[in-house]
Amino acid sequence: MEKNFKVAALYCFADLKHYRQLQKPLLDLCQAKDIKGTLLLAQEGINGTVAGSCAAIETLVDFITAEPAFQMPEIKYSWASKMPFHRMKVRLKKEIVTMGVDGVNPLKAVGTYVDPKDWNALIQDEETLLIDTRNDYEYAIGSFQGAVDPRIKTFREFPAWVLKHEADLKKKKKIAMFCTGGIRCEKSTAYVRELGYEQVYHLKGGILKYLETIPKEDSLWWGECFVFDERVSVKHGLEECGRELCRACRSPLNTESKLSPHYEEGVSCDACYNTRSEDDRERFRERHRQFQLSKLRAMHSHQE
């Protein structure tokens, strides 16, 4: 299958006092170049994932890196067979990745970056505690061998988990953390460093860079890596895995999941059926009908 869409996952922490002034120019450029996805702007920097033609993404990256505050953004590229986003959004936020703890600043203190080629040696060290900083539904479909799953629903819950498990953290000399693209670990390692832990490490470029650069036969990764777009998940080589999302709870679904009697497209799946009321499901049905209608209108407008 031909992959025509270039996907860029990017972030950069910076002292960006004028972030509000960047919203309109970024949105205008993306709309002019038919780029779709989401970019978040805050005083602490920029974060997001976007997709478009190769030339369009290059133009956007050139625009972003021309901003003096964004001289060295972390950018990971991959490809998609179809546009993985429905629209373009540039949002203003308090944080570019929400931890909810004031004063955590990766520009001041952060963990030691570990290149993918050196990651296996670190996490196989008996003195290393390996922590997956992602959400529970992400861990459920793939992670590194031996990683601790904090079982959090959102990244906001991570600081409380750390405080609750400090005794476990102190049992090991080293703490290694990882996430999808690296940004959550910028915050999590900065937070743990502020608590007084010194030997704190994180995977440079995140899981995506590891899966891109480490051959499957040498890998300590099992399963798939959840991504926050219509590809849903990727595997070694950043190949798409063919999953879909439950539109009610955003859990990743495979073919077997869709055979469940609790699965209804756009409405429910095994993971959320018992947590929703019938009123909720009826609301989701109406939302799904409206979504399908909007897709039909978009198709007709392109044909005219």
Curated annotation (Swiss-Prot):
EC category name: oxidoreductase
GO biological process: tRNA modification
Annotated Rhodanese domain residues: 124-219
Entry keyword annotation includes Transport: no
Reaction equations catalysed: uridine(34) in tRNA + AH2 + O2 = 5-hydroxyuridine(34) in tRNA + A + H2O
Keyword vocabulary terms for this entry: Oxidoreductase, tRNA processing
The protein, known as: tRNA uridine(34) hydroxylase
Gene: trhO
